[in-house]
């Protein structure tokens, strides 16, 4: 009877050992296939490339923000080589723009979809520095640069006669320019 128990345990442990080996082999094959597929991709995705570019820009600014060579004004937020003022005060689009100009900045100009990532917690809408130029039939930023193609789809359904508001969660709205909303100023450091 004792020999039977020993033999049964040996048989069970042998079967379990074989199952473990098969599972480890399968895991190895899956891991190898996963790594191979990643290395076959032609290049980084646009989002990864953008994230890399932002990281490079951030690295170039590490020595600047707060070190004395560049610093943001009081109540302004430093982020990726820029200073941002996020208002709590409600103003018309023009009054918001005038405030920004008086502080050597402009209403927010969004250059990438991820630019205002530092304020994703907010649910408010803010005036930004984009308006429709009737003469050129194009959306222009305050510096007269055109709206980038990757941002253009967000502006298809807005009324060109209105001013543009942005929500940090990625929503774009238009509103009568004389309405009062919060606004965001942006000052480029570099």
Swiss-Prot record:
Q: What does the UniProt entry say about where the protein is found? A: Cell membrane
SS bond list: 69-81, 72-83, 100-185, 163-177
Principal localization?
membrane
Task: Cite the entry's keywords alphabetically.
Answer: Adaptive immunity, Cell membrane, Disulfide bond, Glycoprotein, Immunity, Innate immunity, Lectin, Membrane, Receptor, Signal-anchor, Transmembrane, Transmembrane helix
Query: What mutagenesis or variant effect is reported for residue 168 to S?
Result: In allele CD94-03
Taken from the record's topology, the Cytoplasmic segments are 1-10
Recorded consequence of changing residue 176 to H:
In allele CD94-04
Task: Extract one GO BP annotation from the record.
Answer: negative regulation of T cell mediated cytotoxicity
User: Cross-referenced InterPro entries, in alphabetical order?
Assistant: C-type_lectin-like, C-type_lectin-like/link_sf, CTDL_fold, NKG2/CD94_NK_receptors, NKR-like_CTLD
Q: Which SUPFAM superfamilies match?
A: C-type lectin-like
Residue ranges in the Extracellular topological domain are 32-190
Segments spanning the bilayer are: 11-31
Glycosylation site positions: 104, 144
Domain C-type lectin span(s) in chain numbering = 79-186
Q: Mutating residue 116 to L leads to what result?
A: In allele CD94-01 and allele CD94-03
Q: Which GO MF terms are attached to this record?
A: carbohydrate binding; transmembrane signaling receptor activity
Tell me what topology the record assigns in the membrane: Single-pass type II membrane protein
Instruction: One GO cellular component term, please give it.
Output: plasma membrane
Purpose of the protein: Immune receptor involved in self-nonself discrimination. In complex with KLRC1 or KLRC2 on cytotoxic and regulatory lymphocyte subsets, recognizes non-classical major histocompatibility (MHC) class Ib molecule MHC-E loaded with self-peptides derived from the signal sequence of classical MHC class Ia and non-classical MHC class Ib molecules. Enables cytotoxic cells to monitor the expression of MHC class I molecules in healthy cells and to tolerate self. Primarily functions as a ligand binding subunit as it lacks the capacity to signal.
Q: Which PANTHER family match?
A: C-TYPE LECTIN PROTEINS, NATURAL KILLER CELLS ANTIGEN CD94
Assembly, in brief, is: Can form disulfide-bonded heterodimer with NKG2 family members KLRC1 and KLRC2. KLRD1-KLRC1 heterodimer interacts with peptide-bound MHC-E-B2M heterotrimeric complex. KLRD1 plays a prominent role in directly interacting with MHC-E. KLRD1-KLRC1 interacts with much higher affinity with peptide-bound MHC-E-B2M than KLRD1-KLRC2. Interacts with the adapter protein TYROBP/DAP12; this interaction is required for cell surface expression and cell activation.
- Protein name as annotated: Natural killer cells antigen CD94
Q: Which gene encodes it?
A: KLRD1
